[in-house]
Amino acid sequence: MNKNIENFIESLLFASGRPLRLSEIRSILENEGIKADLAEIKVGLNNLEERYAESSLELSEVASGFRLQIKKDFTHLLSSLWTENNRLSKSLMETISIIAYKQPVTRGEIEEIRGVQVSTNIIRNLLERDWIKISGYKETPGRPALLVTTKTFLNDLNIKKISDLPALPEKEEISSKEITGTTAVSYTHLRAHETKKH
């Protein structure tokens, strides 16, 4: 394989600011007159993964494709870069955790699990971050919106699919504290991503 293809792929992933699918990488390379089939691109990605093995960076495959990111072991070093505006509130974390595990879910169902009212600002914030979307409306009086997570949420959480989330304890009644606690490992990824975006 042409070593330059590997370097081109690395440049694209570094500069993109978002995950790139294999087909996107191939299309961009072709637009620049660089011939590479999907097999060559996969080899290039594997080589990058090996090259970053001893680095603070890693190549990660998430729901929307491939991206370069900081390894978990180094995300704590970024805390000094976080401003108060970029911090995720406990109530926001509880709400997104409930949506992730119970989706599709209504605002009323979230409030029932949390035991407190969900602020309109939290829902708006999650919609603005593109972490949730409305997937439809429940066939009950008032037809409340059904909320689900998005690919952006999966990308920011560094997972490919929602089933990659840690399993919840097996019992009928699960509190918001247990749900949020289960996803605490991923909280660092969400905060690190917020730093990168702002």
Regions found by a protein language model. Name each.
Residues 188-197:
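Conserved small/polar residues in nucleotide/adenosyl-binding loops
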Residues 63-75, 137-159:
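Short, cationic-aromatic polyanion-contact patches
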Residues 36-44, 116-128:
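Short amphipathic alpha-helical interaction segments
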Residues 1-8, 69-93:
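Short alpha-helical segments that sit at the start of domains
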Residues 20-28, 104-113:
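Short acidic, hydrophobic short linear motifs in intrinsically disordered regions
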Residues 49-59, 130-138:
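A short, conserved structural fragment
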Residues 77-87, 153-172:
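Short, amphipathic alpha-helical interaction segments positioned at domain boundaries
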Residues 13-14, 18, 85-105, 109:
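Short amphipathic alpha-helical interface segments
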